[in-house]
Amino acid sequence: MTLAIKDGATEIDIVMPLGSMLEGDYETVVDEIQQQKEACGEHDMKVILETGMLQTAKNIKIASLLSMYAGADYIKTSTGKEKPAATPEAAYVMCQAIKEYYDETGIMIGFKPAGGLNTVMDALIYYTIVKEVLGEKWLTNKYLRLGTSRLANLLLSEVIGEEVKFF
């Protein structure tokens, strides 16, 4: 992480310590995330929850809240390597947790669904969840990011009306 920051990284992604989370060792989860945030300094840190491995809405909510209280600037559904990756259900739970955190602290936390966003409709689903649960002030690139490598070309193709292979 230190090397990435020295090389110019302005944001850092970390994966939540899933073993500790699934064992109910929340103190270790918070300690590890806080240590990583300390190493990030002023740089934004995204905590990846791997929601597919968390399996339940309860676990996803707990993981979301622990991450935010430990210093996450964003919470992210997944790396995209595990299946399932992002799901609308997980996104809804995460956005509810962000709203709860915001209502308690006044701090806006970003949200990033990643993995499995393959169509314009997928993007619209996540956009709508964020808009309905969190409100329009979250609909900026500061607070909503879509993690996808294919979607940019699909969106450009939709807008232009012909196939684009820019990215």
Regions found by a protein language model. Name each.
Residues 1-111, 118-149, 157-167:
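Alpha/beta enzyme core
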Residues 153:
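Metal-centered catalytic cores of metalloenzymes
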